[in-house]
Amino acid sequence: LEVVKKIGDVNMGLFNKKKSDFIKIKIEDLIEWNEPNGNGCVVSDRITKEGFKVGYMYREQPDEQNPDSGWRFLAGNEDDEYMANSNNHHIFAINTICNYDKDIIPFLHSKTGSCYIRVDSNNFELDDGTKSICVEKRKR
């Protein structure tokens, strides 16, 4: 665990041994996360290393063996081969990912099974399979 910030008893930041490849950002306290299974989430390197916004996010049943929120965040341009390589995605504290892309915050308490796509620079919608994902890089 690479602790970027400690909030009370909760460590916030990277759950990964190598942080040098990740885009460095200032971590602020943006959310309070009190859900029982923890605050971990799986995030594509396209977001944390390449600078893309979250384009596709879904919440699956959390892994009860780990501090897992169930959230999975992708840029939206990852293919099966990219995702099959475990070196291309990492576990982060959910507050950290909110700092990479604040647009996800209103959706975080959605129920398990929820799936959203970015439909333009600032908006997400429930994914019903009829719209394309808006894939874009963050402005620095």
Model regions and ranges:
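Short, Lys/Arg-enriched N-terminal segments with co-localized hydrophobic residues
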Residues: L1-N11
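Short, aromatic- and cysteine-enriched interfacial helices/patches
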Residues: G13-K17
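Short acidic, Pro/Gly- and aromatic-enriched capping/linker segments at domain boundaries
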Residues: I27-D45
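Short, acidic, Ser/Thr-enriched surface-loop or helix-capping motifs
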Residues: T48
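Broad, structure-driven detector of short, well-ordered beta-strand segments within folded domains
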Residues: V54-E60, S114-R118
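Acidic, aromatic-enriched beta-alpha/helix-loop junctions
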Residues: M57-F107
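Short, compact, well-ordered microdomains
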Residues: I91-K137
